[in-house]
Amino acid sequence: MKKSIVNDIGLYKTRLLSMLTEDSDICGLLLNKEDFTEAEANGLPYSQIFPYLYINTQAETKTCLCFEVDVPQIPTGMIKDMKITAWAYSPFDQMPYEKEGFLGTRPDILADMIERKLHASSQFGIGQLRLESVTSSVLDSRFYGRQMVFTVPDFKTKG
């Protein structure tokens, strides 16, 4: 089967979901405990880690991590630009969080953990992901967080 440019959106999302659920610091922050089971970590996708922007306004409010992958431009016949946008957000009543080696509010610390994890990865594109921006975001009247944008060039199609 011939590969498509859009196929890498799903590939990046699959890799991100796997990487983020395997990180003990990220899972500990989301689960709000240091000691958690593998089953609890495996339960995070689609409950607190989403491969799309999602704000659950109906259920219990929890800290969440969302991400989206885009192809903003295809500058040459061989290379395309990939963009990963990540949102780390918490309810206003869950802002305090402490973890050795990290500073800030819960969304700040989660954003820092995400950046450290992605910066160390070589699973995306050609070279390292480049952090383009980190901005604050009020997602609705109950949630505050950070939006991060990463970019990396990648081959137009693979295979």
Task: Map each language-model feature to its residues.
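Short, flexible/disordered intra-domain loops and linkers
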Residues: 3-4, 95-105
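Acidic-leaning, charged glycine-interspersed low-complexity segments
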Residues: 28, 104-159
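Solvent-exposed residues in well-ordered beta-strands and their adjoining turns
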Residues: 70-72, 87-91, 151-155
